[in-house]
């Protein structure tokens, strides 16, 4: 429905009205009054009959200034055969087909059975309809049930909030009229809080610390950045600011660039560009008086960049700010020749280049230094909240270290390695690891006999999950401790399962046009010192991009990725549901890594982390630290086994005298008879239990 996009642009942006009389000045029309002194006319209409190809009666329509912008479909919670998804289908299929003239005006759709209430758009998949669980900034989320209905009505449909959502938080990509993205409540409150904080901290009056946003990995921080950027770009007080979005890795830069360069209309600026070189960065920023949205990596700010601009309306938004953009000092390092060299941190170089800019940090794992550089946390959205909202799935833990010859002495060696690893709150770019500790760790984890045991157990575990249909698409990632270990493991798996490394098309007959791919691939950047076989296997940058695309393709034959550092942060594959970890990781890096399996995907109930090294305590400690104290630990498969065993014992007691042979092998009459017999036995047992309880109570 291309008209929907155009109508929304008129509603959100307004439009000029040209007079027939050239002597009269043209008018600029705004369909919605966005000022606080609200002059809009709101009307709720119930059960309005609308005739299109057939007659339909939407339950509720909210009109603003005569425009049907919010459409409700309600279902009863007392009829088991009527579901919330039925309401979704009624709006997005039947109403779209039969009364499309109504739907082309919609800003958002709401479905509710009073217990469950969600919102989305005509183009939103059902699994991405979410609840609005917060009324106002700083308040707690609604617990659930009826509370979520009232929170949606008093929060999302609050006049001021609804106006803002309609005009600033609905986004159509430039190249599509069939994609319409609407904010989730944490994105709305985060963008609003950051926007106000930036205004208060702008230089020269402020300190240039725009604030830190702590958002759980997978909660959609890149869209929060997009929403925030629009608010900044349209603010007259900022005089057409220049926005610089900074990441620390090329793949993250590519992902963010893909969103922003397709949002020029939404951002109200045609100059939205990815900066690929230092020279281009200098050219774009040095003499620019205003405007523009630029995406780059922090590494572009090298020693030679020097001063780029002294303007005060430059906003630098840093993605994953905890990793590389904290060092404001000069550090001294020893090179391979034993010479002492002075090196300026990326953060210092960035601020030297743009001394009067305001800096904003986005992170899923905030540390103290993040707030020292970017300012206090202005809004928070934890992993626990994300799971409760259905934005991400739960992560389940399974320990298998005992199965791969990792005894307590070797675990002690790995613990010694941890002591030399990144200390909590430190950046990996600031720490020189102990060579001895690293060597000991690699000797333990790379032991040939151990790797054989790991490979054998991995194959058994992975194939069992495939057989049991415990994985939605068979996508798995194996994290190794070093390049050498990853290469050795790949060769062992190739020897044990040679067909895994042969390029094939997906087994699905409908995928004949897909690119052939091996089931198992080693994903690393090759180096000049790699041997010929490894060098050829790893391929160049274009080959790695192909692997990236294939792994993200749910139905491609590429199912298992062996990695060391690549793809463990900022790499989204919603169908990925199994991660095998054989690498010492802790703190924010561990949270970022395991979050690869927490994305929502149809049929995916949880993400599984399989531990070959013994990181359970590190996982619980890290998540406890980064969850605002609202986390009770990872679910463990051993706990599930205990629960199932307990339930089986209860069932065994209930079915103690049940004739299973007659039930499974008898004729229909015999099956019915034994079922009734069991039902009577169950009633008798329940009656005895109740009598015992009454006797005990008296």
Q: What feature does the model see in each segment?
A:
Residues 1-247, 251-267, 289-293, 311-313, ...:
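ATP-dependent helicase/translocase motor core
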Residues 216-217, 322, 342-370, 390:
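Conserved helicase ATPase motor motifs in RecA-like P-loop NTPase domains
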Residues 322, 338, 519-637:
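Conserved RecA-like P-loop NTPase helicase motor core
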Residues 601-697:
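Long, hydrophobic alpha-helical segments
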Residues 290-349, 542-548, 563-565:
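Conserved RecA-like ASCE ATPase "motif II neighborhood" in helicase/translocase motors
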Residues 142-143, 371-473, 490-491, 495:
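Interdomain helical connector at the RecA1-RecA2 junction of SF1/SF2 helicase-like NTPases
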Residues 436-563:
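Conserved C-terminal RecA-like helicase domain
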Residues 261-307:
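Inter-Walker segment of RecA-like/P-loop motor cores
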């Amino acid at each position: 429905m291309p008209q929907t996009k155009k109508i929304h642009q008129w509603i959100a942006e307004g439009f000029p009205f040209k007079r027939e009389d050239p002597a009269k000045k043209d008018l600029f029309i705004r369909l919605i009054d966005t000022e606080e002194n609200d002059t809009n006319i709101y009307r709720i209409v119930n059960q309005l009959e609308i005739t299109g190809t057939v007659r339909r009666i939407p339950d509720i329509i909210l009109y603003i200034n005569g425009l049907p912008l919010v459409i409700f479909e309600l279902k009863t919670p007392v009829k088991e055969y009527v579901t919330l998804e039925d309401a979704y289908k009624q709006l997005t299929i039947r109403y779209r087909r039969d009364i499309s003239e109504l739907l082309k005006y919609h800003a958002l759709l709401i479905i509710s059975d009073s217990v469950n209430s969600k919102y989305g758009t005509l183009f939103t998949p059902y699994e991405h309809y979410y609840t609005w669980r917060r009324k106002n900034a700083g308040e707690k989320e609604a617990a659930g049930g009826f509370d979520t209905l009232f929170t949606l009505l008093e929060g999302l449909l609050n006049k001021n909030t609804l106006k803002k959502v309609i005009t600033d938080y609905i986004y159509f990509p430039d190249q599509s009229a069939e994609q319409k993205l609407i904010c989730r409540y944490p994105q709305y409150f985060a963008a609003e809080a950051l926007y106000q904080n930036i205004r208060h901290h702008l230089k020269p009056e402020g300190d240039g610390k725009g604030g830190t946003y702590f958002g759980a990995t997978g909660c959609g921080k890149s869209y929060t950045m997009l929403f925030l950027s629009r608010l900044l770009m349209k603010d007259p007080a900022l005089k057409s600011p220049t926005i610089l979005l900074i990441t620390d890795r090329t793949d993250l830069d590519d992902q963010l660039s893909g969103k922003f360069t397709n949002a020029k209309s939404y951002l109200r600026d045609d100059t939205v560009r990815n900066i690929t070189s230092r020279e281009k960065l200098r050219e774009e920023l040095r003499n620019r008086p205003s405007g523009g949205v630029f995406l780059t990596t922090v590494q572009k700010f090298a020693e030679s960049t020097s001063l780029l601009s002294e303007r005060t309306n430059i906003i630098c938004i840093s993605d994953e700010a905890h990793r590389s953009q904290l060092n404001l000092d000069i550090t001294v390092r020893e090179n391979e020749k034993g010479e002492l060299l002075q090196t300026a941190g990326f953060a210092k170089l960035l601020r030297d280049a743009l001394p009067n800019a305001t800096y904003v940090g986005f992170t899923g794992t905030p540390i103290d230094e993040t707030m020292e550089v970017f300012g206090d946390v202005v809004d928070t959205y934890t992993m626990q909240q994300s799971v409760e909202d259905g934005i991400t799935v739960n992560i389940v833990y399974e320990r298998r270290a005992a199965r791969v010859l990792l005894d307590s002495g070797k675990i002690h060696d790995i613990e010694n390695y941890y002591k030399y690893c990144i200390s909590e709150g430190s950046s990996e770019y600031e720490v020189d690891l102990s060579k001895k500790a690293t060597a000991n760790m690699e000797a333990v984890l790379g032991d040939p006999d151990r790797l054989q045991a790991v490979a054998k157990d991995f194959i058994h575990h992975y194939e069992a999950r495939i057989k049991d249909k415990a994985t939605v698409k068979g996508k798995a990632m194996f994290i190794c401790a070093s390049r050498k270990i990853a290469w050795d493991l790949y060769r062992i798996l190739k020897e044990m399962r040679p067909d895994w490394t042969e390029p094939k098309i997906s087994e699905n007959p409908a995928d004949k046009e897909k690119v052939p791919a091996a089931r198992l691939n080693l994903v690393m950047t090759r180096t000049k010192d790699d041997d010929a076989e490894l060098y050829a296997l790893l391929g160049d940058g274009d080959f790695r991009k192909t692997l990236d695309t294939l792994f993200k393709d749910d139905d491609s034959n590429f199912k298992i990725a062996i990695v060391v550092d690549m793809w463990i942060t900022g790499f989204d594959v919603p169908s990925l549901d199994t991660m095998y970890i054989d690498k010492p990781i802790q703190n924010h890096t561990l949270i970022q890594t395991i979050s690869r399996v927490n994305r929502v995907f149809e049929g995916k109930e949880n993400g599984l982390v399989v531990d070959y090294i013994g990181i359970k305590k590190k996982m619980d400690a890290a998540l406890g630290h980064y969850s605002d104290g609202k986390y009770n630990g990872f679910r463990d498969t051993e706990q599930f086994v205990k629960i199932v065993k307990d339930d089986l014992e209860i069932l065994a007691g209930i079915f103690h005298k049940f004739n299973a042979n007659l039930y499974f092998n008898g004729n229909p009459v015999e099956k019915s008879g034994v079922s009734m017999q069991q039902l009577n036995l169950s009633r008798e047992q329940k009656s005895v239990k109740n009598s015992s309880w009454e006797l005990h109570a008296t």
